[in-house]
Amino acid sequence: QERGQEFRDGVQVATLDPFAGYKKALDDELDDTVAVLDAFHVVKLGTTAVDEVRRRVQQDTLGHRGRRGDALYGIRNILRAGQERLTDRQKARLDAAFTQREEHVEVDVAWQAAQQLRDAYRHADLATGRKIAEHVLESLPTCPIPEIARLGRTLRQWRAAFLSYWDTDRSSNGGTEAV
């Protein structure tokens, strides 16, 4: 309101975190503006879901939080990285942890889901990235892993703002948040 109507009329795209308060403020004050979920925050939601699965499976299988020497605890930092950045040694560590126990398959599937989400954002072609994102929206909410299904429901709830990323030439608030 301080900047005036002319400024508000000039705002065409607004990137935001997946927080309902931001969306409500945007709808109230800039109702013709296209809302776009910021890629960093969406990928962070995916990474957080993977970590929640890892911690739950760790607790369920061993009865305690992660400790040095526990397979899933040992890969916790690797799980935060993008698949394209992993060394051969890190890939081998992931594979060893995922195959150590049958229950670890949940962590593997969760990690693959998060990587698919990252791939949508990283794809060089916007149309292909959007197709990957649409597939994510269709598949994650029905995932039998509760944390991943919750992520899928969250993304489905934000569907328009999530998919707007590919319609607005990769709009991001990274520059603003870096200040």
Residue ranges and their predicted role:
Residues 37:
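Short loop/edge segments at beta-strand edges and connector loops
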Residues 28-34, 50-55:
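Short secondary-structure boundary/capping segments
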Residues 2-32, 40-44, 63-179:
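Acidic/histidine-rich catalytic cores and adjacent linkers
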Residues 42-63:
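Short alpha-helix plus adjacent loop in nuclease-associated cores
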